[in-house]
């Protein structure tokens, strides 16, 4: 199945209500970088201009600047990002203790259940992957650090949304845009609110083929020293690989144990900072 591009940037527009310190040219340059993603790794000048809302001439200037800085390469007709763009996010990721704390637990869980495991955080209306141990490829999209998916259609997203207070959840539901990614995807605020209530009762989430057909994912909350949900850990499997009874009896307990272990280590780290 082909999953829609969920990382496409918003078209850059003039922002008359912005702060006097707002730098429009910087916003435009960042939009060019964000135009590239898992579904658009190589793009023409016209593609970039269309994705960002910039003129071809303006998009070309930004692309040439990014080439000079080492963030973009070109063969004369197509443009693509270089690994150097990872530096832009590395300062933030390296400052987090979470990925370092989580990784050994993800590795242990992946070894135990023979499935891929991940940790993500909530950013706006998306989940963003900050740690991952891949075992087998299930999805058609390649998942790496920084990959984003819409929170409403993912197990990790629903766990993170369940950790919000009611006002924060209402704010999310008012601005989220629901799309039927598969025939199983929840597409209304009312349905999602009911799903989140179930997550809060159970302490974990199972999403069955809502982000991609054939993909079943489980997620549980990671909490900091104060008990606040700060991230989510998940494991993903093919929907046909396990009966739902096995999922509840074997995979869920293993996942909850991992979430608890990460939370404990994270709290210990924060206490000693």
Predicted segment positions?
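Short, structured helix-loop boundary elements
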Residues: 22-26, 82, 95, 99, ...
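Amphipathic alpha-helical effector-binding/dimerization core
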Residues: 78-176
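Sensor-regulatory modules in signal-transduction proteins
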Residues: 222-225
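Short hydrophobic beta-strand micro-motif common in sensory/regulatory domains
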Residues: 216-220
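Short, solvent-exposed recognition segments
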Residues: 2-12, 138-213
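N-terminal helix-turn-helix
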Residues: 2-100, 260-268
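Juxtadomain coupling helices with adjacent low-complexity linkers
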Residues: 231-273
């Amino acid at each position: 199945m082909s999953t829609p591009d969920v990382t496409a940037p918003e078209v850059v527009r003039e922002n008359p209500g912005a702060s006097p310190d707002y730098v429009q040219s910087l916003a435009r340059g960042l939009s060019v970088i964000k135009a590239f993603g898992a579904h658009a790794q190589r793009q023409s000048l016209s593609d970039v201009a269309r994705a960002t809302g910039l003129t071809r001439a303006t998009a070309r200037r930004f692309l040439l600047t990014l080439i000079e800085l080492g963030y973009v390469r070109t063969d004369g007709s197509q443009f693509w990002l270089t690994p150097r763009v990872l530096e832009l996010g590395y300062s933030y990721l390296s400052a987090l203790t979470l990925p370092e704390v989580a990784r050994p637990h993800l590795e242990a869980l992946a070894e135990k259940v023979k499935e891929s495991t991940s940790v993500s955080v909530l950013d706006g209306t998306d989940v963003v992957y900050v740690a991952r141990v891949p075992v087998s490829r299930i999805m058609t999209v390649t998942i790496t650090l920084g990959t984003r998916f819409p929170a409403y259609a993912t197990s990790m997203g629903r766990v993170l949304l369940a950790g919000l207070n009611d006002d924060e959840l209402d704010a999310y539901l008012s601005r989220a845009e629901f799309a039927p990614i598969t025939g199983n995807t929840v597409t209304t605020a009312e349905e999602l609110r009911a799903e989140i209530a179930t997550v809060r009762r159970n302490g974990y989430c199972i999403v069955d083929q809502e982000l991609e057909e054939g993909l079943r994912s489980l997620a549980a909350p990671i909490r900091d020293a104060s008990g606040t949900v700060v991230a989510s850990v998940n494991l993903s499997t093919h929907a046909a690989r396990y009966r739902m009874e096995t999922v509840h009896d074997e995979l869920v307990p293993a996942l909850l144990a991992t979430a608890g272990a990460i939370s404990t280590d994270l709290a210990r780290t924060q206490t000693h900072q």
